[in-house]
């Protein structure tokens, strides 16, 4: 029941998912009864496949992840993952503390056999259709070459079956396209990725550079978590930055008589449309790839729409047996 807008937006998202889907799955809503019960009373839930599970403790955004997971065993986060571990639930979704989600997922669910380190990716828009996934974006700051290879392999499985990308394309983020570029660990990763390509596990096109991410040269861009998280946070700042300078510039043109009000409104609408590809709420969240269960985390500011779409993502991963396919590939 985490997130900046919880629990109201979580309850709304759950209700929307059940109604929109025609009740094709059951949802266990986990949280503090005294806060959730009044919200549920606002909806007609009688015909919905919805059960409530009381969890008295809360892991906040300020909590130290590993410490909080151990100390707050009765939190919605830990209780939800334990339900998955016990096979009483098939997936867990939350917009709570990402670090705590990652720590709890690994602690409670463990790793898929053969996985060295679970990972997390991010969405980036690209020229043309579709999206680019950047992996890793903070789960693994210090990576070995073999970690980068597994990230590419796991995300290839996810894209192929869950995202319906027929032929995912893997690029290794580096300071140049040539094979011998970059530090030793990237040179080794290149060789190992090329071997995986030859074994037909992935479709590896070699090194790519930063400008290739938005250009759409690859559907999967592999890097360590430090680089990935830095790029992610920079990318998240772009719409806000451009919006902050665009609005005053537009107002100045109107004030100077160089642009009429109607044209300014149209320009503003066009500007908003440009950044529609940056809207990740259409996907809801991202799964932790490599943990032995389905654990999906959304942005802390997730809306009801994002919660609903995270639920659909979980359903799709279950149907496509993504984790089973990852385990089979790594066996």
From Swiss-Prot:
Classification via SUPFAM superfamilies:
Isocitrate/Isopropylmalate dehydrogenase-like
> Family per UniProt?
Belongs to the PlsX family.
Q: Which reaction does it catalyse?
A: a fatty acyl-[ACP] + phosphate = an acyl phosphate + holo-[ACP]
The protein's UniProt keywords, in alphabetical order, are: Cytoplasm, Lipid biosynthesis, Lipid metabolism, Phospholipid biosynthesis, Phospholipid metabolism, Transferase
Q: What is this protein called?
A: Phosphate acyltransferase
Q: Does the keyword Lipid biosynthesis apply?
A: yes
A Pfam family reported for this protein in Swiss-Prot or TrEMBL: FA_synthesis
What do the Gene Ontology cellular component annotations say?
cytoplasm
Query: Which residues does UniProt call coiled coil?
Result: none
- Lineage, please? Bacteria, Pseudomonadati, Chlorobiota, Chlorobiia, Chlorobiales
InterPro entries from the UniProt entry: FA_synthesis, Phospholipid_synth_PlsX-like
Q: Name one GO molecular function term.
A: phosphate:acyl-[acyl carrier protein] acyltransferase activity
Biological role stated in the UniProt entry = Catalyzes the reversible formation of acyl-phosphate (acyl-PO(4)) from acyl-[acyl-carrier-protein] (acyl-ACP). This enzyme utilizes acyl-ACP as fatty acyl donor, but not acyl-CoA.
Name its cellular compartments.
Cytoplasm
């Amino acid at each position: 029941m985490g997130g900046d807008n919880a629990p109201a937006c979580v309850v709304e998202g759950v209700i929307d998912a059940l109604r929109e889907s025609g009740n094709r799955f059951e949802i266990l809503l986990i949280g503090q009864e005294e806060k959730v019960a009044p919200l549920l009373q606002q909806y007609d839930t009688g015909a919905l496949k919805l059960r409530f599970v009381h969890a008295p403790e809360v892991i906040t955004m300020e909590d130290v992840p590993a410490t909080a997971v151990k100390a707050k065993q009765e939190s919605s986060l830990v209780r939800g993952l334990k339900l998955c571990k016990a096979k009483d639930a098939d997936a867990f979704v939350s917009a709570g503390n990402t670090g705590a989600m990652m720590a709890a997922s690994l602690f409670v669910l463990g790793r898929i056999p053969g996985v060295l380190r679970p990972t997390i990716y991010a969405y980036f828009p690209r020229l043309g259709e579709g999206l680019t996934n950047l992996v890793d974006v903070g789960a693994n700051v210090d990576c070995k070459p073999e970690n980068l290879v597994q990230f590419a392999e796991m995300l290839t499985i996810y894209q192929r079956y869950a995202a319906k990308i027929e032929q995912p394309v893997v690029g290794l983020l580096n300071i140049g396209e040539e094979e011998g570029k970059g530090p030793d660990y990237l040179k080794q990763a290149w060789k190992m990725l090329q071997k995986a390509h030859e074994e037909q596990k992935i479709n590896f096109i070699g090194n790519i550079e930063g400008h290739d991410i938005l250009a759409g040269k690859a559907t999967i861009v592999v890097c360590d978590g430090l680089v990935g998280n830095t790029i992610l946070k920079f990318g998240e700042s772009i719409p806000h930055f451009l919006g902050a300078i665009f609005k005053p510039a537009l107002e100045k043109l109107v004030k100077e008589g160089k642009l009429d009000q109607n044209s300014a409104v149209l320009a503003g609408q066009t500007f908003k449309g440009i950044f529609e590809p940056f809207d990740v709420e259409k996907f809801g969240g991202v799964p932790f790839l490599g943990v032995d269960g389905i654990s999906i985390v959304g942005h802390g500011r997730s809306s009801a729409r994002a919660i609903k779409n995270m639920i659909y993502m979980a359903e799709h991963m279950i149907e496509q047996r993504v984790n089973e396919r990852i385990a089979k590939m790594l066996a």
